[in-house]
A protein has these predicted regions:
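Polar/acidic, low-complexity leader/linker segments enriched in S/T/G and N/D
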Residues: 1-85, 207-216, 220
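Short, surface-exposed beta-strand/loop "edge" segments at domain boundaries and coil↔beta transitions
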Residues: 2, 56-65, 96-101, 128-136
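Residue microenvironments linked to proteolytic maturation
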Residues: 3-18, 86, 110-212
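Short, flexible beta-strand-to-coil junctions
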Residues: 54-60, 93-96, 159-167
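Short conserved beta-strand and strand-loop elements enriched in small hydrophobics
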Residues: 83-100, 156
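Short coil-to-beta-strand transition motifs
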Residues: 101-103, 176
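Charge-rich (especially acidic), low-complexity segments
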Residues: 215-233
Length: 233
């Protein structure tokens, strides 16, 4: 199989598209707070489920890319079928591959829906019995759950394959785009990528859209994530 090139920030062409600022899983959000408190009991029967922002359409992201509404909604509809089949696994930290490595799987996307131009989702962390019963961290899902229980906000990195084309001032994702998954990553703060609990939060998001365009490219972050990945292995 021919290895796909990872397209860097503001680069056009065909390759692997990784969006470090796609969204967030915020443990301090009021919709997640009850779930976090329940998870602290380490009850084996209690699942680690969280709400998250997964992606956004028609908004230029930090990589200088825009996902058109038609394309992202089409891929979201396809992904719903993957969810129904129980195949919507994703990884902790993004690999430089279009394939999902089962040894690195940390969570399952159990539901997705739209809130305006925001693709929302529900994640189930795939934790081990040892983590629930004794707090032993042995899997990627355990690592993610332990971070969430400690109040760490995790980034959501969408992963897909497709082409980018310069359209006016934007690098626009083309019709050949195929969504692969939504990985959990450690990402620097990005204004606006959070769960909208109320209208006030949505207004704050609208006010900070321009700030996203001023953030530096994520090449340094990708290097940092590679080091973190080696540490977790």
């Amino acid at each position: 199989m021919k290895e796909l090139k990872i397209l860097e920030s503001n680069e056009i062409g065909h390759g692997l598209l990784i969006e470090m600022d796609a969204g967030w899983v915020n443990p301090k959000d009021k919709l997640n707070l009850d779930l976090i408190q329940e998870s602290r009991k380490l009850d084996y029967k209690a699942p680690f489920e969280f709400f998250a922002v997964l992606q956004k359409h028609d908004i230029p992201n930090r990589n200088g890319r825009t996902y058109p509404e038609k394309i992202l909604k089409r891929e979201a509809d396809k992904y719903k079928k993957i969810i129904e089949k129980g195949l919507s696994t994703s990884e902790l930290n993004h690999p430089e591959s279009s394939l999902i490595d089962l040894d690195r799987v940390s969570h399952l996307i159990t539901d997705i829906w739209w809130d305006g131009n925001i693709l929302m989702g529900k994640l189930l962390l795939l934790t081990s019995p040892g983590f629930h019963e004794r707090g032993i961290v042995s899997t990627k899902g355990d690592v993610a759950a332990n971070l969430m229980r400690s109040g760490v906000t995790l980034g959501v990195s969408s992963r897909g394959v497709g082409s980018l084309k310069k359209v006016g001032e934007k690098n626009e994702v083309q019709d050949d785009f195929e969504l692969i998954c939504f990985d959990l990553v450690s990402s620097p703060s990005t204004p606006g990528a959070y769960l909208f609990s109320n209208k006030e939060d949505r207004d704050k998001y609208d006010e900070k859209l321009e700030e996203e365009k001023k953030v530096e490219p994520v090449s340094d972050v990708l290097k940092l994530m590679s080091k973190l990945d080696r540490y977790l292995k």
